Structures are given as C-alpha cells and as structure tokens.
Amino acid sequence: MGLLSSSDGQRPRLLGLLQRYSTVLCLLLYPIGLILFAGLAWKPLNERTYFSDNSLLPGMVERASRIAGNAESLLESLELEVAEHPGLPTAWLAGEFRRAGLEVYRHNFSLAYPFGTRQLYHGENLYAIMRAPRTSRTEAIVISVPFRNSASPHGSTLASIAAVLDLAKHFRRQLYWSKDIIFVITEHELVGLQAWLDAYHLVETSPGVILPGYLEARSGSIMAAVNLELQDKHIDQIDVKIFGLNGQLPNLDLVNTCKDLLLRERVPYVLEGRMDPEESRSFHGWKHAATNFVSQIAIQATGAPSAGHGLFHRFAIQALTLRGEPKVPGYRHVGLTPVGRVVEGLVRSVNNLLQRFHRSFFYYYLPSSDRYVSIAYYMTAFGFLTGGVLFKALALLLELMDQHPSVYLTLLWRALPFVLGLEALGAGLFSLVTHGVDIVKHLVPLYTQDALYVFTVAASSSLLLTPLFIRNAVHPLAQRLLMYLHFLLLVAPLSMLNISLGTIVAALGVPVVLTAGVNCPLPIRIMRRLLQFVTNPLLSSLLLIFCYAVVSETGSLKIENTEQLYRALNQALQGHRRLFLFALEDWYMYGAVTYPLFCLGFLPVWSHMWTL
C-alpha cells in the first residue's frame, strides 16, 4: 500500500481530503449522474447522426424495383398454398426461387426442450443463394423472413415472403452484385434462425438444445442482414428494430442508411415503436426525446432481441429488422413497392462496401432517428452515477488502515471467504435450476413456468437468512469495503456488456449500497432495511413490471379503483413468471446472459448488502 503514503510515512493531502469528504462526494455524484442521464436526451447534449463510411452512398444507389403487382400475385398463390398445407410450403417456395435462377437448399434442425422430458421438436428452413456474377463470392448479404401464417399470434409474414420472392427475381436480372445474396425463410421463429446461423458458421451456440444439422451449401462471410416482417401488403409504417441479444446494437452507419432510404422513399417509420420528437429545444421536445430514451433503456436492459435480426450480432453481422403492421382503415398506407425499394437500397449500399462495418459507433442511444448519444457521453454520466461507491471504498480502506495498520490485510482476507460463499450459492442456484424445476414438478403438479417460478422464489428467499450465519463473524469495515468492491465488479463490466441494465442496477443500487452498514438511529435503520428489501432483485423486477402494467392499464401511474389494481397485479404476476421462463429459455437456446447475471451477480451482491 505504498501508493497511499509518501516516503516519510505521511499520507498525501489529496487522500486525506478524500477520506474526510467522501460522504459529501457521494451525496453530490449520484444526483449529478442522474441529471446527466436525463439531460442526454436534450438536443444540445447529443449529436446529429452522420455517415462515417462514405462507400455506403445511399443517395447514389438507384432503386428500380417495382414489386407491387407481381408480389401481390405471388401473395395470393402463397395464401392458397398455406391454406391447403399450414406448414412451411418448402416445395412451392423452392420452385419459385428456382424459377428466379437461384440455388435452393433445405435445412433440417431439431430442438430438445431443456426442461421436463426434453421433448424433441423438428423444423425445416429453406434458403436460396444468388451467386455474385462479378467476384470470387467470398462475401454475402442475408435477407431473412420468419414464416408465420395467419394463425400466428405474432401476425402473418406471407407478404414479406412474397416481397422477397419478387425482389430475388429483380436482383437476379442485375449484373452489379459483388456479394452473394442469401434469402432465408425460417420456421419456428428465432429457433430456426439460430439453427441456420449455427449450421452456417459450423458452431453450436446451445449444445444439446438446438441441434443445427448441416447445410448443403454456403457462401462467404456475411457482411449484413435485413430481417423483413411485413404483416400485410398494405401497412401504416415501418418499425425499425435495432436491439439484439444481450443489448447489442448494429453499426450506426447501417441504421443511418436505413433511415435515409426510408425518407427518400417517403415511407413513414418509427424506431423501436417510438416516433421522433419535435425538432425543438423546448421542454415538450425534451420530454418526448427523454421518453424515447427511457423506452430504449427498458428494451435493451431485458437482453432479449427485439426481433430476429438480434441473433446475427453474435457473429459480428450488422443487422436490423423492418417490421410493418396492417394499415388502419381510413388512413394513408404504404404498399410493397416502396418497402421493396428500401430493402433494395440497403442491399445495394452494403454491396458497395469494401470491408466490414467498422468506422461508426457500436455503442450508442438514439433519442430520435437523427440524433445519437455516443458512448463518451453516457459513460461519463455512468461514471458520476457509480463514482461515489468507488470513492467511498477508497475512504473505507484508508479508515481500515488507520484503525488496524498492521493487520488490515488479514482482516480483508478473512472476509473474502464469505464473498466466495455467496457466489457459490448463486452458482448452485444457476447450475441446479433444471433439476430444481423437475423436483418441484414431481412434488406438485405444476406447469414448467410455474415450477421454475416457485423454485427461483424459494431459493432466492433462502438468502434472506444469510445474516444469521455471518453476524459478528467478519470485521464490519472489511465487510463493507468488500461489499463496495463486489458491487463495482458487477456494474463496471455490465456497463460495457449492457449499459442499460448496468444503469438501472446502478440507479437502484447505489443509494442502498452506500447506506448499508452505516451506524444510524433505529427508525432510519428500519427504513434502510425496508429499502434493501424492496431492492431485492426478485421484488424490484416485480415492482417494475407492476408499474408498467399500471401505465398500460390506466395511461399513468394513478390507480382509480380496486378493479384496475387487481388487473395490474394479475398482469404483473403473470409477466413476472414469464420473465423468468423466457430468460432461462433464452440462456439455453440463444446464450442470453440475463438469467446467469441474476444468479451469479445480482443475488450474491444483494445478499452481501443484506448481511450488513
């Protein structure tokens, strides 16, 4: 610890000031961080989007496709085919792609459901490759569509398939392609797409769960992908989906290219379901932008992809989804031709690239489609938000050195096994979850969703007893110091993996962490315990879902009668159960890290705080 003292044994003045005023720093830095995050949505504090890679040239790309007539005819034929054969019409699709002059292949895969009897499901994808006539075929672009018929709860995508078929015929007649174009029609939503990507790259993302099979043919390295989900031949607007697995984002240049083409084709659009705010520096404009900002934080924090494009990001493939919902009668609608031209423009722009996307941002927020917040801005706000914990940890270390100058390291080493024990408990919960679900279902006849919820709640609630085993067994200052470091070791890496989730954890956790273990009067200690209990990962996630349910039910956080309260509570409990099931399924099938973070990060850190 020579860095904390000078050669004559005196402590540097700066460290002395830090130790004396650490509490003041904590009181200042946290609200400054919150204010900075709120201010990032204000126009003067963010930047206008721009193209970093001029080779994309969306304004120079000629978009000549006119697919409306042929695509509508194909759509009618496809609807008749699906009415007779509800599954993926592989024979019909293969015939259409072959008539367009493409190589057509089928891809079989299987899913072994990871719970219960591990029931085996089978599926089939179909993909067609249009080989580039001008190069050695070492690079490719993917256009994917998930197959959904009219009975799907997510809406039919037959219009997307018809549009893609006609685009394939148009593309095949052109000679300027320098990259192969792969058209992929997938079955079983994200499972089919994940299986195809695994088979294409010769990997297994989820060994023993998704069995990807093999592909008869493939192309080169995939540069970019467009996932198309049109629910009708006439739509109101395009919803651009950008969030991927674990909060990953496509390169900002690809998003800017898509936005530019939508504007040029006069296609109304929204970004992740939110309209652009007014071009104004007024409070109303900031409020709209801040609402978009908070909405993006909420979507990204879940770690789940907002659409099928999100599975491409793991393989360094820049991708986004264009989703169109059926038009509302009486309002202006958009046909297939302008949407087809947007897709054509995107593919042609990527076709111009000489190397992978790398010049623009991969870490950003978009308060509107033409304004962005770069990592330099939001990480500064995050630093202020969590900086108080770091300074307080350093101040505690100095205090521990003053009180026990010869044995402070020994005290820290004695406290370390408790931290490792908490992590071991979290690892046990994570590794035994499938067995725990089977045990609960054996004892009580419950569905998998309910059995998982019962096991998770029971196992997590047992951590409330940890203070009984640790009280007075570890030096309180050493335990507080390690708790601060434990918290920082969670949120610091999380800020790079998923900044939105890290921000939510920091915003909820910093006040509770800083006040844990501090000597104070009994009434304040009781309030602190209540606050710690509310910030339990299980309870806090339930409260957030309840608030969302109330807003969805009433349009605000105000509940007017008991019926609204009952409906909101019922929706929150149902959503909370589904949250854990989906998080665990996403981990086993796609590698989403939300459930591992819950078991290995959030619960151990909260339990550590609870013992103080």
What are these language model-derived features?
Residues S150-D253:
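Acidic/histidine-rich catalytic neighborhood of metal-dependent amide-processing enzymes
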Residues N292-V294, A304, G310, R314-L446:
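Non-cytosolic juxtamembrane linkers/loops
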Residues E62-A64, L75-L88, Y113-G116, P146-L158, ...:
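Second-shell loop/turn segments in exported
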Residues A128, I143-Q194, S460-T466, A492-P493, ...:
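Alpha-helical metal-binding/catalytic segments enriched in His/Glu/Asp
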Residues G2-T23, R66-P133:
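A non-catalytic alpha/beta surface segment that caps or lines the substrate-entry region
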Residues R13, P31-L88, G308, G324, ...:
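N-terminal capping segment at the start of a domain
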Residues A224, L230-R359:
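Active-site-adjacent substrate-binding region
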Residues G2-K43, I375-L612:
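Alpha-helical transmembrane segments of integral membrane proteins
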